[in-house]
């Protein structure tokens, strides 16, 4: 069985993340969505909220394939999380050349530390290429319409978060 790991902060999960997740599911039997925990950062959504949003979004968008997705937290190196969970592939999404430059450096470092783990780059669909979680949070905080950028469960959660 091929297992892929897809790491990020997912604060919140966006349609861009879901696009990469769909691509990962074409390559692997199981995809682990790994939420990185950074002690110095204050996320908008708690870990439990992000897990719930990823799971709800996967069910809403991926339907039966959602059963092939699991969500974990990790701190430290993603390669350690990949090893712990038996992943052979590390999936990374690319929006533009800036992402490529950064991700190539990371793939090189990860490849040196964990040669058994193959990094796979998935170019973002043009329809989601400009979406970032940071911009989604900013738009939502100013009362803008974020529905084109996030799955329905995330739009509802953002609207609730910023109305309170």
Swiss-Prot record:
Q: Name one GO molecular function term.
A: pantetheine-phosphate adenylyltransferase activity
Query: Which SUPFAM superfamilies does UniProt cross-reference here?
Result: Nucleotidylyl transferase
* Location(s), subcellular: Cytoplasm
Q: Which residues bind substrate?
A: 9, 41, 78, 92
Q: Provide the residue positions that the database annotates as binding ATP.
A: 9-10, 17, 93-95, 103, 128-134
Query: What are the required cofactors?
Result: Mg(2+)
In this chain's numbering, which residues are marked as the site (Transition state stabilizer)? Answer: 17
The EC code for this enzyme is 2.7.7.3
Question: Which controlled-vocabulary keywords does the entry list?
Answer: ATP-binding, Coenzyme A biosynthesis, Cytoplasm, Magnesium, Nucleotide-binding, Nucleotidyltransferase, Transferase
Gene3D superfamilies according to UniProt: HUPs (3.40.50.620)
| Assembly with partners or alone | Homohexamer.
Q: What is this protein called?
A: Phosphopantetheine adenylyltransferase
Q: Give the gene name.
A: coaD
